[in-house]
Amino acid sequence: MDYEHQTIITRAIIKAAVLMSEYGAESILIEQTAQRLGRALGVDSVEISMIPVAIVLTTLNHHQSVTTTRRVHHKPINMSIVCDIQKIVIAIEKKSYDVTYLLAKLKEIQPNYYNRWLVVFMVGLACASFAFLQGSDWVAFFITFLASSTAMFVRQELAKRRFVMIITFGITAFTATMISSLSQLNGISSTPNIALASSVLLLAPGFSFVNSFLDSLKGYLMMGWGRWMEGILLTIATSIGIIIAMAILNIKGW
């Protein structure tokens, strides 16, 4: 294998690794996938180093090494991308495809989004159902549904316009709190606090916290701390949005 061909393989592997990192894959899965691709494509070994904003990858073959670095731009979590890459890896391992196949397949990968109106409806229903389980009356149930559905729509629109995630969470929390406060200001519900609390549940950054814990537990401390800080910042942004809405409406708390 000459140096030029090894360079192409290195760039293809790191492209797959960056895609997985951008869409929320666990760090150990990214490393294992890169190593499997390297072996399947004919290099002796693959070494990878990850931080939240970049990946450094080196391929070794007969005492010849190629190193490359790529920046990671975080995007909304999408496990369909991760699954597609895993399928490509399995196909290369089983059928001995070359790097051209890998590059072609990576170009074909597109996020598999659900219908946006279905997402809006299901998020609203999930938050409203949680409110009902916590003992809300039917008025609070429907207000929670309206508030969280509208908030999800706002979140989608802001994401489509490529707003920073922190700003998106803050504005979404503000919107949800403003709408759900109808149950408290007009006295039409006996359980307004439940509606206020339940309407912002769509903003809980659970995936970031779970991944941060798993990464830290498995030795990827930099990735773990980075994802933990991301979750903390999103939580703070959500809290600021709620506080601003409550201050405007002079609501004293849940």
Language-model region placement:
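Alpha-helical transmembrane segments and their cytosolic membrane-interface
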Residues: 74-140, 230-239, 250
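C-terminal ends of transmembrane helices
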Residues: 105, 149-162, 208-223
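Soluble N-terminal domains of membrane-associated systems
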Residues: 1-97
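Generic detector of multi-pass transmembrane helix bundles and their immediately adjacent loops
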Residues: 185-254
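Core alpha-helical transmembrane segments of integral membrane proteins
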Residues: 113-186, 190
